[in-house]
Amino acid sequence: MKKLFRKLTCALLLASLMLSLSGCSVLKEILAEPTEGRNDGKYIKTSNELTYPDHVASYDEVHPKHKPGNLKGSDAVARLNEVESTILKHVISCYVDADILFENPEKVGITNADPKTAWGDATTPASKYPEKKAFYEKQRDLLLEIDYETLTGDDRLAFDKILYDVEEEIYCYSYTAFEYYTMIFNSLVGPQSEVLFLLDVFTFDTLKDAENYILVLKDIDRYYDQMCEYEETRAKYGFASSPESYEAAAATFDDLCKQKDDCFLYQSFEERLDKIKGLSSSDRERLIKENEDAMKNVVFPEFEECAKRMRKLKEAGGQDAGLSEYRGGDAYLEMLNRNQTNSGKTVDESIKKLDQEITNLQKERSQLSKRSSEWKSEYNSHRYSKGTVTQNLDYLRDAIKKDFPKVPAHEYYLMDVPKVFESSFSPAAYLGFHLDNFDSNVIIVNNRNVDSDFGVTVAHEGYPGHMHQSLYTRSHTKHVYMYVCGSTGYKEGWATYCENYSMRYFSGNGMTDAVRYCQIDNDWTLLLSTRVDYGIHTEGWTLEECVSYLNAHGMFVTKSSFKRFYTLLVTDPCYYVKYGMGYVWTSNVMNNMRTQFPKATDMQIHTAYLDSLTCTFEQIEDNMKKTLK
């Protein structure tokens, strides 16, 4: 599968023939080859060179029950560690990932990352699918030799998580069409939207670090060529996006190219050189020149090339369509839903749960509105913030002590959003890099977008949200896999739950009706957006139908105002689903535990949840029951 983009949380949260642009051979190939397949009006025609599922696989097909193996005790643990190490080396195989994820990658066995091919491979060509599938089948078979019942503690949790993920990978690599359903260069969330910011994250402790960084810059040429080739191959197979989407992608590269002469990375590079102890003036001068040369003669020319290649694809005559309009799209969505939501629930089960949650919110909002109006004054004047990001972090760190478990001693530092990103970046974000060092935590701050509810944003990103969870997980397991390969649905579900929970700390009166109404407001937009995401990909909702649905639920949007987000949801399936359903399933686990264990305190429930690590929500709930009983 392709690495859609490297998430700035950096715990997430991924050699083909290069096609020349010297002529029009690429476009001729795209337009000349007919897209075979079903032409009954039900599906968009796509190539029969690819393989497609003939049905939607059930959970039991992907995750069948297994008999216990024969390896017990220390032999079982050794086998688990062996498989984990093998998978980590397979997943973290490039310099960029290794350098960002770990301060000392060699200590976790990552020694094969070459800075000359720093970004690794952007995609997995269909021809490599059998090899990938065989790799994961071998790891599964090795795991199944373990007698699961003899494992204890985080070994048992790691076994559950790794086996689940391995079986998902086996299914994922069973059908080559799965590689091509989605666009890489999405204009809103594609890798080009954050590449400059990501480059600013690299730190230099030694001369070699700076020299390797320049190799990272030079490798952008090869890496982005791979992604362009992917888009061209995707169009060749009949999955071309709309001319509007390709133009929007090209425009993002145009915007990058405008920074060629005064990009913030020039100054940032020089400032990072200041951190290298004993750097000679001659080496400093050389590195500055090499950095500028790589930026102006490799990076920005590559972005110009990408813009040209995306505009060329406009002639392929594609369209933006939901997954339900493609052969095998329903099976792909089912797999994607499990992966992104961190749950084994089906798409239908997820939609049913989501619709019920939306109905419940609607009823609760109506009931609150009919109550005494005293709370409305608090709601209208609320200010859920203590000031700056530091003031909010200091306040929350103390306020949450009675409800959330301790995390290890650690440090964090603040990083201002570069001015070029201020208009589009959220008020704050957590960046956990060098996950083998508790002191490597960054809170990225965008002072331009700070609002009166900044405190709950800080709760989402810091305490008790992303930073708190990351620190706790890393300090409560010896299995690196559990914090490197955690699902986005798990992480965002926890952080959004914490965002809502933390409103009570700012109200001055604890959990009030006004606080609850603010929580409903928070949930409302997220869950409706999630429902639209499902509607597009399961029921083929058009732009008009999405706008109609949102307006029927009081959102007051127009076709023109929603068009950009509609395109995002069509071209990036499950974009909102991973956030919305991650939150729904997290809250569902918490509510179930409070119902089943009414004497348990929130501290006990939150601790049991975090102690269950980054397993699926079903696995987490099972483990919590054993802990809380």
Where are these regions (language model features)?
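Bacterial N-terminal signal peptides that target proteins for export
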Residues: 1-11
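N-terminal maturation segment of proteins
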Residues: 30, 34-629
